[in-house]
Each structure stands twice: as structure tokens, then as C-alpha cells.
Regions:
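HotDog/MaoC-like acyl-thioester-processing domains
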Residues: 1, 73-75, 86-128
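Intrinsic-disorder/low-complexity, polar/charged segments enriched in Ser/Thr/Lys/Arg/Asp/Glu/Gln
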Residues: 6, 17-23, 64, 78-80, ...
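A conserved, well-ordered hydrophobic junction motif at loop->secondary-structure transitions
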Residues: 16-57, 61-62
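Hydrophobic beta-strand-centered segment that forms part of the acyl-chain substrate-binding groove
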Residues: 48-80, 85
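A structural signal for short, hydrophobic beta-strand segments that form beta-sheets
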Residues: 11-16, 62, 85-86
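Surface-exposed loop/turn and secondary-structure junction residues enriched for glycine/proline
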Residues: 14-17, 34-35, 41, 64, ...
Length: 128
């Protein structure tokens, strides 16, 4: 649903409508000056863009996101995200994303991604 260049991090593997894997190295400019902890929006963006990339659609939107920041991340950490489509219902894809650093889960998210292509198709079918 999104272009490879729009993914936050480096895409390592992608199986449309199934799973995706990406990696991101946390640099000094990604952390808060006072605490040295990575800004949360980098992990959210990494997870969300990977979830969008997994969906095989021209256009898709994030309808719902449930996120949990589990462990603080510092500069120098290498994050690995894995997105898995857990199920699909009509135009909605339910995707679980886990981000790990050194095999420890630091972030997790559950997203509902809506395929706008399929939504439009369903609406046309209902009108007919």
C-alpha cells in the first residue's frame, strides 16, 4: 500500500498480505537530549509503515492502532520489526507488529489497516 522508500527503516522481507520484516538503527539524533531515550514516534512510524507495506492495495489507511512501548531504547540500538497479518475481514487487515532489540521486545502494536481499493469495490457491489 506504500512505496518502499516511505518505509521507516530498511525493508528486509515482504510477503504481501502475510508478513514483513524491517530494521532500523537508532542514531543520536533520534533520541531525547535529556534522557537519551529514543523518541517513541520512530518506533510507531517503523511499525505503522511496515504494517501498511504488507497490505496489497493501491491505497490503504490505518484505521486503528493499539501500541505498547515496553522497554526504553537508546542510541546505537538496532531494531528489528516483524509485521504479521493475523486475519482479514472484507476490506480490513488485522496486523500484529513486534519490534525487538537484542531479541527483547521493546514495542508492540496491533493495527487495523483498511484497503481503500477493496472498500470502494464493496461499495460498488452493494449499490448494484
Amino acid at each position: 500500500a506504500i512505496d518502499k522508500k516511505d518505509i521507516v527503516g530498511e525493508l528486509l522481507d515482504l510477503e504481501l498480505n502475510k508478513l514483513g520484516i524491517s530494521t532500523l538503527k537508532i542514531s543520536n539524533d533520534m533520541v531525547l537530549e535529556k534522557t537519551g531515550i529514543a523518541r517513541g514516534y520512530y518506533m510507531f512510524a517503523m511499525a505503522n509503515t511496515l504494517a501498511l507495506a504488507v497490505v496489497d492495495a493501491e491505497k490503504a489507511l490505518t484505521a486503528v492502532g493499539n501500541v505498547k512501548y515496553k522497554v526504553p531504547v537508546s542510541a546505537g540500538a538496532t531494531l528489528v520489526a516483524k509485521a504479521v497479518v493475523t486475519h482479514k475481514r472484507m476490506d480490513k487487515y488485522y496486523i500484529f507488529v513486534s519490534i525487538k532489540s537484542n531479541n527483547e521486545e521493546v514495542f508492540r502494536a496491533k493495527f487495523i489497516i483498511v484497503s481503500m481499493d477493496q472498500r470502494a469495490k464493496h461499495e460498488r457491489e452493494q449499490e448494484a
